[in-house]
Curated annotation (Swiss-Prot):
WD repeats: 27-65, 70-114, 199-239, 244-283
Entry remark concerning the domains of this protein: The first protein part may form a beta-propeller domain involved in specific binding to phosphatidylinositol 3,5-bisphosphate (PIP2), leading to the association of the protein to the membrane.
Tissues in which the UniProt entry reports expression: Expressed in roots, stems, flowers and leaves.
Keyword Cell membrane in record: no
Cited SMART domains: WD40
Pfam families attached to this UniProt entry: PROPPIN
Quaternary structure, from the entry: Component of the PI(3,5)P2 regulatory complex at least composed of ATG18, SAC/FIG4, FAB1 and VAC14.
Name of this protein: Autophagy-related protein 18c
Function: The PI(3,5)P2 regulatory complex regulates both the synthesis and turnover of phosphatidylinositol 3,5-bisphosphate (PtdIns(3,5)P2). Required for autophagy.
Taxonomic lineage: Eukaryota, Viridiplantae, Streptophyta, Embryophyta, Tracheophyta
Alphabetized SUPFAM superfamilies for the sequence: WD40 repeat-like
Length: 393
């Protein structure tokens, strides 16, 4: 598989790319094609059949939208709250190919670079110094400044486009499916080290990293267990149970303080779990100076500690018989729950002050709160149908 990178001066002129809303566009309701959180979950992007829209979460408002004459995008990847986005065509009647990434500068209203491939792009991930393009069997890692190809990573079939990055400036970690079923490959670029984690017996369905890349949370296509790993040595630190029945996991989110984990699935419940691990210490990765921390010290910077300040996940009433009864009876179950529709995909993320934000492919936005001491059913604080908002910017 090869790729082509270009700096398309004059290829996509602003006037030919952006289009003011015509009367036909105003009459035709835009269809939601995709939703995606930005790196710190303060905003999310919605790809539509007409273009894309950007929403702020606290307070909730549409910050801007772009209507395009040639259809919409199936991938709209933000770079925190900056003016840079990665766009991949898709959706009804889109004229933009699904095999090309456009790097869009919204301040200049133009495409500043593009990446063309020979097969469909499954995902694009951004951090301030890297552009990562995910194909079904390969991942390309580029330097953001000069668009130089830095790494190529082979994976097993990856139709979901699974890949996640660290976002601290002093770490550079990438996690993706490995070459074997249930395997995850963790690249520590600063340490020039690869860690292979045998996470599940079934294929990987969902994964996420903490912002510093020290912790990895995973789920398989079975969808019953979520596991948390140390990315340095592959140690499993904790395992929690979503349920007994098979489920399709849509999202896994870790709170910034690494005390909570949220999971959404096709079962119509968003689960919150209490984590017993937290990050202690810092690493010293620098993109200029390379790895300033030894592998041993880096590994020691992550310790599994019991936190006395938060509640614990409930276990089975028969957990006293662990070792005698099956593993199920010693499982940790969710600490708090919120119920949504089972007929559409929902993606959860943590907000401030023990809140969770949930966005759905039906155009719904929920904000709910959970009790960090007692757990239980979460309370709904806000509901908005963001595709039908009247207060446009």
């Amino acid at each position: 598989m090869s790729s082509t990178v270009s700096n398309p001066q004059g290829i996509l002129q602003p006037g030919s790319f952006l289009l003011p809303e015509s009367e036909s566009m105003k009459k035709e309701e835009a269809e939601l094609v995709s939703v995606c959180w930005n790196q710190d979950s303060s905003c999310f992007a919605a790809g539509t059949s007409h273009g894309f829209r950007i929403y702020n979460c606290e307070p909730f408002k549409e910050t801007f939208r772009r209507e395009l004459k040639d259809g919409g995008f199936k991938i709209v990847e933000m770079l925190f709250r900056s003016n840079i986005l990665a766009l991949v065509g898709g959706g009804p009647n889109s004229q933009y190919p699904s095999s090309k990434v456009l790097i869009w500068d919204d301040h200049q209203s133009r495409c500043i670079s593009e990446f063309a491939f020979r097969s469909e792009i499954r995902a694009v991930k951004l951090r301030r110094d890297r552009i990562v393009v995910v194909l079904e069997h390969k991942i390309y890692v580029y330097n953001f400044m000069d668009l130089r190809l830095l790494h190529q990573i082979e994976t097993q079939a990856n139709p979901r486009g699974l890949c996640c990055l660290s976002h601290h400036s002093n770490t550079s970690v990438l996690a993706c499916p490995g070459l074997n079923r249930g395997e995850i490959r963790v690249e520590h670029f600063g340490l020039n080290m690869v860690q292979i984690i045998n996470a599940h017996d079934s294929s990987i369905a969902c994964m996420t990293l903490t912002l510093d890349g020290l912790l990895l949370a995973t789920a398989s296509t079975k969808g019953t267990l979520i596991r948390i790993f140390n990315t340095m040595d592959g140690t499993r630190l904790q395992e929690v149970r979503r349920g007994v029945d098979r489920a399709d996991i849509y999202s896994i989110a870790l709170s910034p303080n690494v005390q909570w984990l949220a999971v959404s699935s096709d079962k119509g419940t968003v689960h919150i779990f209490s984590l017993r691990v937290r990050v202690v210490g810092e690493d010293s990765y620098s993109t200029e100076n390379g790895a300033l921390l030894t592998q041993q010290n880096y590994s020691n910077s992550l310790q599994g500690l019991v936190s006395p300040t938060i509640g614990t996940n409930p276990g089975s009433s028969l957990s006293f018989m662990r070792g005698v009864l099956p593993k199920y009876f010693s499982s940790e179950w969710s600490y708090a729950q919120f119920h949504v529709s089972e007929v559409t995909q929902f993606f959860a993320a943590f907000g401030s002050n023990n809140t969770v934000a949930i966005i759905g492919m039906d155009g719904s936005f929920y904000r709910c709160s959970f009790d960090p001491v007692n757990g239980g059913e979460m309370g709904q604080l806000e509901y908005i149908h963001f595709m039908k908002m009247d207060n446009r910017p």
